[in-house]
């Protein structure tokens, strides 16, 4: 894959967090309201998806409710992934298909039955205080070792 430059300049704290998140299977970041958690997580997930050597890796940004995820993260996904040649967006499914076959989807935790059993390579849990406590052990812990982030008010890493 050619060298891709995403227009994201992490703040000093975000640079530290990116390095630390890569060292652990699960990460929890407790940060203030305007710390840039969503932008950081979206870009971390984008990098992971683009560099994952697996065939068609799958990543999820999980919000308490799907419309909330659309409001908080979808525009950022389009902003940053839109700079990658060959990227396609499915507005109705809130899905970003990257040129290497990787996929990032926004899901809501309100229907926990619908997200059980899906195979993920990475997941960001947003606003975890508003997500049922059973979601993490049933969904994230069964995700392969690659990456899960919890952000409080919000990031989880599988």
Language model feature labels by segment:
Residues 1-152, 157:
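Phosphate/NTP-binding elements of NTP-utilizing enzymes
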């Amino acid at each position: 894959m050619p060298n891709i430059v995403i227009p994201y300049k992490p703040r000093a704290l975000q640079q530290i967090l990116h390095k630390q998140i890569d060292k652990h299977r699960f990460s929890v970041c407790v940060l203030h309201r305007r710390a840039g958690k969503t932008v950081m997580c979206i870009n971390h997930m984008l990098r992971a998806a683009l560099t994952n050597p697996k065939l068609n890796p799958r990543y999820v940004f999980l919000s308490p409710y799907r419309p909330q995820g659309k409001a908080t993260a979808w525009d950022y996904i389009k902003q940053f992934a839109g700079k990658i040649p060959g990227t396609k967006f499915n507005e109705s499914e809130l899905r970003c298909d990257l040129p290497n076959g990787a996929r990032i989807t926004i899901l809501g935790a309100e229907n926990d039955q619908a997200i059980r059993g899906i195979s993920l390579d990475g997941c960001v849990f947003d606003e975890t205080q508003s997500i049922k406590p059973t979601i993490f052990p049933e969904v994230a812990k069964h995700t392969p070792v690659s990456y899960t982030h919890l952000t409080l008010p919000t990031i989880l890493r599988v």
